[in-house]
């Protein structure tokens, strides 16, 4: 049923992939991405774990209304999260490459 190497080989391969995924997740948590809004007037840097590292607001926005600034901050944060998730997908794809997965199954679980 499992061919040469059998179930033991499959389990070893799964364990190696799990170790690689854990290492990759640790690396991803250390990466930093920056999201922007308002043509770069608001920038938010987050790490791969989506923790905010920095917020940069152009001084010209301090004179504008509060609601607009809040919207720009939210948009920049959402952009940063989207970029972090894209980066995570790219990094994790290298770990799962070569291992056949059943249809619909994705890593990380």
UniProtKB/Swiss-Prot annotation:
What InterPro entries does the record tag this protein with? YbaB-like_sf (IPR036894), YbaB/EbfC (IPR004401)
Swiss-Prot/TrEMBL keywords:
Cytoplasm, DNA-binding
The terms under GO molecular function for this entry are: DNA binding
Q: Name one GO cellular component term.
A: bacterial nucleoid
Q: Where in the cell is it found?
A: Cytoplasm, Nucleoid
According to its UniProt record, what is one Pfam family this protein matches? YbaB_DNA_bd
**Record carries keyword DNA-binding:** yes
What SUPFAM superfamilies is this protein classified in?
Answer: YbaB-like
Q: Tell me which PANTHER family the record gives.
A: NUCLEOID-ASSOCIATED PROTEIN YBAB (PTHR33449:SF1)
Q: Quaternary structure?
A: Homodimer.
Q: What does this protein do?
A: Binds to DNA and alters its conformation. May be involved in regulation of gene expression, nucleoid organization and DNA protection.
Name the family: Belongs to the YbaB/EbfC family.
Q: Which NCBIfam families match?
A: DNA_YbaB_EbfC
* Protein name stated in the entry: Nucleoid-associated protein CGSHiEE_00780
Q: Which organism is it from?
A: Haemophilus influenzae (strain PittEE)
